[in-house]
Curated annotation (Swiss-Prot):
Keyword hit for Cytoplasm: yes
GO cellular component, one term: cytoplasm
Protein known as: Transaldolase
Catalytic activity as recorded in UniProt: D-sedoheptulose 7-phosphate + D-glyceraldehyde 3-phosphate = D-erythrose 4-phosphate + beta-D-fructose 6-phosphate
EC number: 2.2.1.2
Pathway as given in its UniProt record: Carbohydrate degradation; pentose phosphate pathway; D-glyceraldehyde 3-phosphate and beta-D-fructose 6-phosphate from D-ribose 5-phosphate and D-xylulose 5-phosphate (non-oxidative stage): step 2/3
Entries under PROSITE patterns matching the protein: TRANSALDOLASE_1, TRANSALDOLASE_2
Xref: SUPFAM superfamilies: Aldolase
GO MF: transaldolase activity
Swiss-Prot/TrEMBL keywords: Cytoplasm, Pentose shunt, Schiff base, Transferase
Length: 327
């Protein structure tokens, strides 16, 4: 019997969720995803100093003011790590724009275009880049504009169906619903009632989105994310893509138990699902009605924003050190 990893690869595209290029290399995955939190964990490791220092030097050479230089450096760090990651996989990498722009459509569009152009200018193939945009109303409007310009988007921080429907209407390439964070909210709110994996709220949320998409022939891909256990991953076998931490990927490689398809487009077609009307007011009302989605979206933006600021502080210190050496 082959490993669960190999069996799962026959049902879903497996994606490695990390900022560490070496872990991507050993993951044997098709694609990779990263974010400021993941890059922060590895950016200051000695083995990646060259990626960091090159980004800082490049940013300084752009001759912007202090704020512009910091923006240049942060995006170049992402690009450098993204390109390094792409050396080890055949598919795509997802890079994220600054979460502090989450409620400014125009700013997100401009930043995503800059990131995409910087990626290409640094030697990357735009076809292998997904730009991660948060699943706010403003973010999804940015996605619609970006997709029309040929910039493929990954709508992240998806916590309920109305976000997924809005992203599909915007013709997003891909969405990332967060299994584990949904599960975390339910446990924190109502306690651990020993959810069976079939009743896991995070798994159920992604399953519902999958059913809706396949029922109505929506081409936007679903990449389930933020897993807390191998069991959650296996419960979504058949989802278009699964982005999984290196730790859980290793667990899948060590287990040879049978893997069963859980999500099937043909089965989704048979279900009685009604289309949901979408307007901005409906989106905002249904988000407001969903305490979990509202709270986890806000929390996710705060976490990514906070980690970006920590990374900024570290980069600022590096810039000061370089400036002092040049004096």
């Amino acid at each position: 019997m082959s490993s669960q990893f190999e069996q799962l690869k026959l049902l879903s595209v497996l994606v490695c969720d990390t900022g560490d290029p070496e872990l991507v290399k050993s993951s044997e995955s098709q694609d990779a995803t990263t974010n400021p939190s993941l890059i922060l964990k590895v950016a200051q490791e000695p083995k990646y100093q060259e990626l960091l220092t090159e980004a800082i030097a490049w940013g300084i050479r752009q001759n912007g003011d202090d704020v512009q230089t910091l923006t240049f450096v942060l995006d170049k760090i992402q690009v450098n790590f993204g390109l390094e990651i792409l050396k080890h996989i055949p598919g795509r990498v997802s890079l994220e724009i600054d979460a502090r722009l989450s409620f400014n459509t125009e700013a997100m569009v401009q930043r995503a275009i800059f990131l995409s152009e910087l990626f290409a200018a640094s030697g990357g193939d735009k076809k292998r880049l997904l730009v991660k945009i948060p699943g706010t109303w403003e973010g999804i409007q940015a996605v619609e504009l970006l997709e029309k310009q040929g910039i493929a988007c990954n709508v992240t921080l998806i916590f309920n169906l109305i976000q997924a429907i809005a992203a599909a209407k915007a013709k997003a390439t891909l969405i990332s619903p967060f299994v584990g964070r949904i599960y975390d909210w339910w446990i924190a709110a109502y306690g651990d009632d020993g959810y069976s994996i079939d009743a896991d709220p995070g798994v159920a949320s992604v399953s519902n989105i999958y059913t809706y998409y396949k029922k109505f022939d929506i081409t936007t891909q679903i990449m389930a994310a933020s897993f807390r256990s191998k069991e959650q991953v296996l419960a979504l076998a058949g989802c278009d893509l699964l982005t999984v931490s290196p730790k859980l990927l290793d667990e899948l490689k060590k287990d040879q138990s049978p893997v069963e398809r859980k999500l099937d487009p043909a089965e989704a077609k048979k279900l009685d699902v009604q289309p949901v009307e979408l307007t901005e007011s409906i989106f905002r009302f249904l988000m407001n009605e969903d305490a979990m989605a509202t709270e986890k979206l806000a929390e996710g933006i705060r976490i990514f924003s906070g980690d970006t600021q920590i990374l900024e502080a570290a980069v600022t210190e590096f810039i000061k050190q370089i400036a002092a050496q040049d004096v």
